[in-house]
Curated annotation (Swiss-Prot):
Its cofactor is Mn(2+). Its EC number is 2.4.1.-. Keywords: Glycoprotein, Glycosyltransferase, Golgi apparatus, Manganese, Membrane, Signal-anchor, Transferase, Transmembrane, Transmembrane helix. The chain crosses the membrane at residues 21-43. It is an enzyme of class 2 (transferase). The keyword Transmembrane helix applies. Glycans are attached at residues 73, 105. Belongs to the glycosyltransferase 31 family. This is Probable beta-1,3-galactosyltransferase 1. One of its GO terms (biological process) is protein glycosylation. Pathway: Protein modification; protein glycosylation. The keyword Transmembrane applies.
């Protein structure tokens, strides 16, 4: 190949590359480029795949760790609950031993057995006629009282402490009555109207120490009770751990000293004219075993207000307790309980609100029993 310069001289270089060589060099470069490019594209997805697998592996590892932690936390929670229950039982057992310490003669069989309910009938030294009216109506006597315990799991006792002069004439009268009927629970408590809160606390602590039951009940000796209907009403709450059953009310806090239910600590409930927190009326209420055990363990710490029903309500107000407003426990004796009995909806407990019990109960209990009582064999023929 020749070139012509400005001076018109022909010039032919020796090292000039031919067109064919250039073409083959370009083709070779292109092929090499394609080869390396394809190889790099193969490497990148592999790297991305490895990265994705690593992330999945890490994610799976994190999930496994979370599951292990959740399982561990749940297990710890269950163990904590079990330990708390065991601690409560241990404290209750210690309190039981200290509370009883050989004061009561209860058979080992009675201690081991599970009862449905323990009914404590609050009574006083002067209430012999009331007790006799209860014995002649709704409270079984003699062998039937034992049969009630053995077949139906129901304990019924009149509850009373001792007089100021221990072993005095009043105490001896109760001892003689006990020999005849065998239906008393004597408490380590000095009797007195202004000491009802202390008596209630001592009753529940003593009862839960003596008998293992689903429910513990306090009822006044001027209230009529239908035992089969009562058992039916409480059976609906049998599997609840902390339940407080009664006719719930919220009356005014009485600040004046001249009134019957005066509350000396009225200032704790706020301004004058305020009402009490919701609590069961004092004529009749029932609590589950856990709550009775709570009273047993903490009896030295629980504050006592002037009125025992308010005191009981105050002990539960800050706890995780289910309050059950059960109107079958507070029927009126005028026409209410009779009409309900005729309709087949027998009341569990009946009294007169105006008298805070059955008015002249020693005289009228038999009449109320005839009008408002359940069928004679209702308790014995029931399946429960």
């Amino acid at each position: 190949m020749s070139f012509k310069n400005r001076g018109d001289y022909n010039f032919t270089p020796r090292n000039v590359v031919s067109r064919n060589s250039v073409f083959f060099m370009c083709l070779a470069s292109f092929c090499l480029g394609m080869f390396f490019t394809n190889r790099m594209w193969n490497i990148v997805p592999e790297a991305r795949g490895i990265s994705r697998l690593s992330k999945l592996s890490l994610s799976s590892s994190d999930c496994d760790k979370k599951n292990v932690l959740d399982y561990g936390n749940n297990t710890i929670g269950i163990l904590d609950k079990s330990i708390s229950n065991l601690e409560m039982k241990l404290v209750a057992a210690r309190a039981e031993r200290e509370s009883l310490s050989g004061k009561f003669n209860i058979s080992n069989e009675a201690k081991k057995r599970k009862y449905f309910m323990v009914i404590g009938i609050n009574t006083a030294f002067s209430s012999r006629k009331r007790r006799d009216s209860v014995r002649s109506t709704w409270m079984p006597q003699g062998e039937n009282l034992k049969k009630l315990e053995e077949e139906k799991g129901i304990i019924v006792r009149f509850v009373i402490g001792h007089s100021v002069l221990s072993h005095g004439i009043l105490d001896k009268a109760i001892e003689a009555e006990e020999k005849t009927h065998g239906d008393f629970l004597r408490l380590e408590h000095t009797e007195g109207y202004m000491k009802l809160s202390a008596k209630t606390k001592t009753f529940f602590a003593t009862a839960v120490s003596l008998w293992d039951a689903e429910f513990y009940i306090k009822v006044d000796d001027d209230v009529h009770v239908n035992l089969a209907s009562l058992k039916k009403a409480l059976s609906a709450h049998q599997n609840k751990p902390r339940v407080y059953v009664g006719c719930m009310k919220s009356g005014p806090v009485l600040a004046r000293k001249s009134v019957k239910y005066h509350e000396p600590e009225y200032w704790k409930f706020g301004e004058v004219g305020n009402k009490y927190f919701r609590h069961a009326t004092g004529q009749f209420y029932a609590i589950s075993k856990d709550l009775a055990t709570y009273i047993l363990i903490n009896q030295d710490l629980l504050h006592k207000y002037a009125n025992e029903d308010v005191s009981l309500g105050s002990w539960f107000i800050g706890l995780n307790v289910e309050h059950v407003d059960e109107k079958r426990l507070c029927c009126s004796t005028s026409q209410d309980c009779e009409l309900k009995a005729m309709m087949g909806h027998v009341c569990a407990a009946s009294f007169d609100w105006k008298c805070s019990g059955i008015c002249r109960s020693a005289e009228r209990m038999a009449d109320v029993h005839e009008r408002c009582g359940e069928p004679q064999n209702a308790l014995w023929t029931s399946n429960s």
